[in-house]
């Protein structure tokens, strides 16, 4: 399948720590569902995809960007894909070109809401 569904909750947790992207897919979609009840201003979640080595800097720059920008710096070329920030009961998805992922590179997905990225994160890898 060329998509995955991820859930985030009010306890600052994703329900998965790793995503494998089938390298035969042209595009890959991440579907995010917030299973909690808290509003996005208090406990918002998104999914940001970047190289593992860029994760910390992308999250730090994202904090400065604010909620109106989904805690992602505008035009950040280190960001491969990201969803909007959503609150409890909401869903969002993002589709990206699989050619942006290179074999042998380490990729991460994380929530860039302030204070979340150190806990709400996992790995993304190309697989078959």
Curated annotation (Swiss-Prot):
GO cellular component: periplasmic space
Disulfide links within the chain: 2-25
Cofactor(s) it depends on: Cu cation
Residues engaged in binding Cu cation: 45, 111, 116, 120
Stretches of the chain forming a coiled coil according to its record: none
Transport found in the keyword field: yes
Annotated cofactor note: Binds 1 copper ion per subunit.
Entry keywords, A to Z: Copper, Disulfide bond, Electron transport, Metal-binding, Periplasm, Transport
Gene3D superfamilies found in the cross-reference section: Cupredoxins - blue copper proteins
Major subcellular site: periplasm
Residue span, Plastocyanin-like domain: 1-128
Any Pfam family hit: Copper-bind
MF (Gene Ontology): copper ion binding; electron transfer activity
Subcellular location: Periplasm
Protein function: Transfers electrons from cytochrome c551 to cytochrome oxidase. Transfers electrons from the tryptophan tryptophylquinone of the aromatic amine dehydrogenase heterotetramer.
UniProt subunit comment: Monomer. Interacts with the AAUA/AAUB heterotetramer complex.
The protein, known as: Azurin
């Amino acid at each position: 399948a060329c998509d995955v569904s991820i859930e985030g909750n009010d306890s600052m947790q994703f329900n998965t720590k790793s995503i494998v992207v089938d390298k035969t897919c042209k595009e890959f979609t991440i579907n995010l569902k917030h299973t909690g009840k808290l509003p996005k201003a208090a406990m918002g979640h998104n999914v940001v995809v970047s190289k593992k080595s860029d994760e910390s800097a992308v999250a730090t720059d994202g904090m400065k960007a604010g909620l109106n920008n989904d805690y992602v710096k505008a035009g950040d070329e280190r960001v491969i894909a990201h969803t909007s920030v959503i609150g409890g009961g909401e869903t969002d998805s993002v589709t990206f070109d699989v050619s942006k992922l290179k074999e042998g590179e380490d990729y991460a997905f994380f929530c860039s809401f302030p204070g979340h990225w150190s806990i709400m994160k996992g790995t993304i890898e190309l697989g078959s």
